[in-house]
Design a protein with these regions (language model features):
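Polyanionic/metal-chelating signatures
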Residues: 1, 128-184
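Extracellular/periplasmic ectodomains of large secreted or surface enzymes and adhesion receptors
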Residues: 1-37, 68, 75, 92
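Acidic, glycine-enriched loop/beta-strand segments at the rims
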Residues: 21-30, 40-51, 64
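Solvent-exposed loop/turn tips at the surfaces of repeat/solenoid architectures
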Residues: 37-38, 57
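Histidine-rich, glycine-flanked metal-binding segment
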Residues: 44-84
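Enzymes and membrane/adaptor proteins characterized by extended Gly/Ser/Thr/Asp/Glu-rich
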Residues: 97-116, 147, 153-155, 164-168
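Alpha-helical scaffold segments that flank or form the walls of functional sites
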Residues: 102-145
Length: 184
């Protein structure tokens, strides 16, 4: 029936979030990449006609000129383009499953965001698309001392445990202003 074929064709056109983390049995293999001819902002200097070498998902070299390409590297010519470091979001509430606020008591320093990280939150993907590479996940402001934060490296398709940055410092959220008054 032609009507059924038309409906099926139309329904497959509109996918509003990526499938990568859903339905695949493994995460895509990291490839070797060299970005050349870029204007690179390092945070300390601006490098004109610079190159960045990425091997096995890690940046191994940043500098002026061209460098030896890693084996089987994909080469990206970034002439006229800019490359910057990833953005670190120091105050975020993404990737938290039903645990932003602990409002039962004024002090809840014993609770931890690490226990409620949601690795399937579509906002991880959206943050990555906007250049955010790491986030500090904080409790809300329903009480003055809301609990322990978590620092994650944004990686779409990973488990909650694999999002956590190794040997991260521990922090507790304090909210000593109008938010606490408004939420109670």
């Amino acid at each position: 029936n032609d009507d059924i074929k038309t409906v099926q064709a139309d329904t497959t056109k509109h996918i509003w979030f990526p499938n990568m983390a859903f339905g695949l049995d493994s995460i895509a293999k990291q490839e070797n990449i060299i970005i050349k001819n870029a204007t690179i902002w390092t945070g300390e200097e601006v490098i004109q006609n610079g190159s960045i070498v990425i091997q096995n998902g890690k940046i191994t070299h940043v500098g002026a000129g061209n460098f030896k390409s890693p084996p089987n590297a994909r080469v990206i010519d970034a002439e006229g383009k800019y490359v910057t470091s990833g953005i670190i979001d120091e105050h975020s509430h993404i990737a938290i499953s039903k645990g932003v606020n602990e409002g039962g008591q004024a002090i809840s320093a014993e609770v931890s965001i690490r226990d409620v990280i949601d690795p399937d939150d579509i906002n991880i993907y959206r943050q990555l698309a906007g250049g955010v590479t790491a986030s500090q996940l904080l409790h809300g402001s329903a009480n003055p001392i809301g609990g322990q934060s978590a620092i994650i490296k944004l990686k779409w398709g990973e488990t909650a445990e694999n999002l956590l940055i190794d040997k991260q410092p521990l922090f507790i959220k304090f909210a000593l202003g109008e938010n606490v008054k408004q939420s109670n």
